[in-house]
Amino acid sequence: GISESSKSVRELFGKSAGVNILAAARIFMFGARDVWFVVGLPVFLYSAGWDFWEVGGFLAVWTIAYGGIQAVAPSLVSRSTDGLSREVPAARVWAIFLTVIPALLVAGLQTGAVLPVPPATVVVAGLMVFAIPFAVNSSLHSYLILAYAGSKKAAEDVGFYYAANAAGRLTGTLLSGLLYQSG
């Protein structure tokens, strides 16, 4: 059959709690990544002496690794018959890794006086490790949106979720440029 679209903005944003939480998580997840990944990381790597091909090569390798991890992500999360009882707690655990790894990366950068490791090495290693929970969380969220989407408005719920993804990326990109401009 034909699904019915939302009749008002309030109805469009009045999704189920699960859809709204996933959309908010998507905004923050991709916004937080892109705020440093779009401008800050390339500028940092250039300032560390990397050339165009090395910076572009790292970004390409990171993106390809991220895609590869997403491909195997379903095997890293046990499935439940209802599609939510194991998957939602797993998303929470993977979200903790998304918080802890950047904190460890910052701590690693602060130990420069103790451990003679170049900051670029710490950042690159940290980002490669960060790709794992980021990709698993992204994949898991993409699964969960389908589990949470209402049958009558599934396409609208999924579209709302991916619009939130785009909003997060746009926000992160704009903030990345703003931070660069502000010095």
Pin down the residues of each PLM region.
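Flexible cytoplasmic inter-helical loops of multi-pass small-molecule transporters
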Residues: 1-15
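Helix-loop boundary and gating motifs at the non-cytosolic
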Residues: 18-60
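Loop-to-transmembrane helix entry/capping segments in MFS-fold secondary transporters
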Residues: 52-53, 149-161
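A membrane-interface helix-boundary motif in multi-pass transporters
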Residues: 1, 178-183
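C-terminal transmembrane helical hairpin of 12-TM major facilitator-type secondary transporters
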Residues: 88-138
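Intracellular juxtamembrane helix-capping segments at the cytosolic ends
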Residues: 136-149
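Helix-to-loop junctions at the C-terminal end of transmembrane segments
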Residues: 69-87, 180
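Transmembrane alpha-helical cores of Major Facilitator Superfamily
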Residues: 60-64, 159-167
